A protein has these predicted regions:
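Short, solvent-exposed beta-alpha or beta-beta edge segments that form flexible loop/patches at the rim
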Residues: 23-33
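A surface-exposed beta-strand-loop module
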Residues: 123-144
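Polar/acidic, low-complexity leader/linker segments enriched in S/T/G and N/D
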Residues: 1-22
Length: 184
């Protein structure tokens, strides 16, 4: 899967919107029943580039053209939400752990992680990663507390089939606002 180009000139005006698909039924007596049909939320990220050099302009236009707009998902390294440090994954007897991102008390699994360092009771232990699952290479104590540090990517796609860039001055570009939506 392609990674979004490393261009860090986003404007500070960006938003993340969390959406669930909740079905609500109300009986004649007023009793309410709810059910969600999604296991995890869909996120919509709205952002824009405040500044692009001519080289960055060509890079980003080429990237979106290679995706054919919203046709192909890609990996997004979010400027604010992209790493976990000291996240507790479980205890040693399990041996396999799901990488997650923390939102307060809510944990959401992530599939694309890199720069992973795993600790058993605070000591670095060797590990390998496969689609968001962290495997310990060697056995550790059954009650060892397993924590990890890692960088994660969001799997997203363009919400629309278009991406617009404005030429502000000579050799100075900025993008219009664009939306990304998570996909699984």
């Amino acid at each position: 899967m392609k990674k979004f180009p490393d261009i860090r000139t986003f404007s500070w005006k960006s938003t993340k919107t969390q959406q669930w698909n909740t079905v609500t039924k109300r009986s004649g007596s007023g009793r309410v029943r709810t059910m969600t049909t999604w296991r995890y939320p869909q996120w919509t990220i709205t952002t824009q580039f405040a500044y692009l050099t001519p080289a960055q302009y060509k890079t980003i236009m080429g990237f979106f053209a290679s995706l054919k707009g919203a046709y192909e998902p890609f990996l997004w390294l979010d400027p604010e939400d992209h790493c976990e440090r000291g996240v507790q994954l479980g205890v040693g007897r399990d041996g396999r752990f799901r990488a997650v991102r923390r939102w307060g008390i809510y944990l959401e699994p992530v599939e694309y992680v890199e720069d992973v360092t795993v600790y058993a009771d605070g000591q670095v232990v060797p590990s390998r990663v496969e689609r968001g699952e962290i495997h310990l290479v060697n056995a550790v104590g059954a009650d060892a507390i397993i924590t990890a540090d890692y960088t994660y990517y969001w799997q997203v796609m363009l919400a629309e089939d278009k991406f617009a860039v404005e030429a502000v001055f000579r050799d100075f570009y900025k993008s219009k606002s664009f939306k990304l939506v998570t996909c699984r």
